Curated annotation (Swiss-Prot):
Name the UniProt record assigns to this protein: Ribosomal RNA small subunit methyltransferase H
Origin superkingdom: Bacteria
EC number: 2.1.1.199
SUPFAM superfamilies registered for this protein in UniProt: Putative methyltransferase TM0872, insert domain, S-adenosyl-L-methionine-dependent methyltransferases
HAMAP family found in the cross-reference section: 16SrRNA_methyltr_H
GO CC list: cytoplasm
GO MF assignments: rRNA (cytosine-N4-)-methyltransferase activity
Main location: cytoplasm
GO biological process, one term: rRNA base methylation
The organism of origin for this protein: Rhodospirillum rubrum (strain ATCC 11170 / ATH 1.1.1 / DSM 467 / LMG 4362 / NCIMB 8255 / S1)
Annotated catalysed reactions: cytidine(1402) in 16S rRNA + S-adenosyl-L-methionine = N(4)-methylcytidine(1402) in 16S rRNA + S-adenosyl-L-homocysteine + H(+)
Keywords tagged on the record: Cytoplasm, Methyltransferase, rRNA processing, S-adenosyl-L-methionine, Transferase
Family that this chain belongs to: Belongs to the methyltransferase superfamily. RsmH family.
């Protein structure tokens, strides 16, 4: 099996259809991972692709694509939230499309030594890059209230207080260093759900999000995409959990000039004339697109995926950040 294709890129056909790559276009694959989206773009059209990934392991896969598509593919090391600065360093200020596949990759989950998996024992790390604090740093140093808040807000763990208390009690005896130890403590507090989801799932998600500042990266990437895309360029985002999708949905609705309706049964009203700037995007599809059953059977990871796509208008980018104020 080719080193670039041991895992399936989620909703690849839908992503390519939404982006509509064309010859001589310049596209950004903000989450290179295993290179599925980049390869799809390069094979679909005679375009150029700039990929971004903070994971050092991506460099080998990127080098293979650079050799296969000389002059058309470049991998930049860094966070996709910094795409504006990364592209500026390459002399690029305008692009035709951005694809973002959010969250942790299957490869990272499969490698126990990366510390993302609660099913395989490994060091309690969870960093997508090599910089910053690890998950072990968080669970061994944060006070109980702060730890509970993280588990609740970023993992939507309803028993966050109980989990945090159990973690603090256990670390008083022996600090955490392995994923299996943390998962065991969590499973001792949280029952397995009826749908079979592992009790450690939500807590591990919360820690991973905080370690890698995933939601902050997403907000920065959305704003950067808005500023970089030329009129007619498209932004396509595939999210895997509700926290990500809420941010993307709110950004899309705001930038498309849609207000939050007072009732889901009433039509959406435009807020473009209510003191807001004109819409910088228009929706490609009215609702989030879900993967086909055929894909979820082959790739169960895709079941929770939600794709949202928008097209850049001719109006200027907003000065308000996706998650902040003007």
């Amino acid at each position: 099996m080719n080193a670039l294709t041991p895992h399936f890129p989620v909703m690849l056909d839908e992503v390519l259809s939404a982006l509509e790559p064309h010859a001589d276009g310049l596209y950004v694959d903000g989450t290179f991972g295993n290179g599925g989206y980049s390869r799809g773009l390069l094979e679909r059209a005679d375009c150029r692709v700039i990929a971004i990934d903070r994971d050092p392991a991506a460099r080998v896969r990127g080098a293979a694509l650079e050799a296969e598509f000389p002059g058309r593919f470049t991998l930049l090391s860094g966070c996709f939230g910094d795409m504006e600065q990364l592209l500026a360093a390459e002399g690029i200020s305008r692009i035709d499309g951005v694809a973002l596949d959010l969250g942790v990759s299957s490869m990272q989950l499969d490698q126990a030594e990366r510390g993302f998996s609660f099913q395989k024992d490994g060091p309690l790390d969870m960093r997508m890059g090599q910089q910053g604090q690890t998950a072990a740093d968080l669970v061994n140093t944060l006070d109980e209230d702060r730890l509970a808040d993280i588990l609740y807000h970023y993992g939507e763990e309803r028993k966050s207080r109980w989990v945090a208390h159990a973690i603090v009690e256990r670390r008083a005896e022996t600090p955490f260093s392995r994923t299996a130890d943390l998962a065991t403590v969590i499973r001792g507090v949280v029952r397995k759900s009826r749908d079979g989801i592992d009790p450690a799932t939500r807590s591990f998600q919360a820690l991973r999000i905080v370690v890698n500042d995933e939601l902050g990266e997403l907000e920065r990437a959305l704003g950067a995409s808005e500023r970089l895309l030329r009129a007619g360029g498209r932004l396509v985002v595939v999210a895997f959990h509700s926290l990500e999708d809420r941010i993307v949905k709110a950004f899309v609705r705001q930038r498309c000039g849609e207000s939050e309706g007072v009732s889901r049964h009433l039509p959406q009203a435009s807020n473009a004339g209510a003191g807001n700037p004109p819409p910088s995007f228009q929706a490609v599809s009215r609702r989030a697109v879900k993967p086909l059953d055929a894909e979820t059977r082959v790739n169960p990871r895709s079941r929770s995926a939600r794709l949202r796509a928008v097209e850049r208008t001719e109006f200027p980018a907003w000065t308000v950040s996706p998650g902040g104020q003007r």
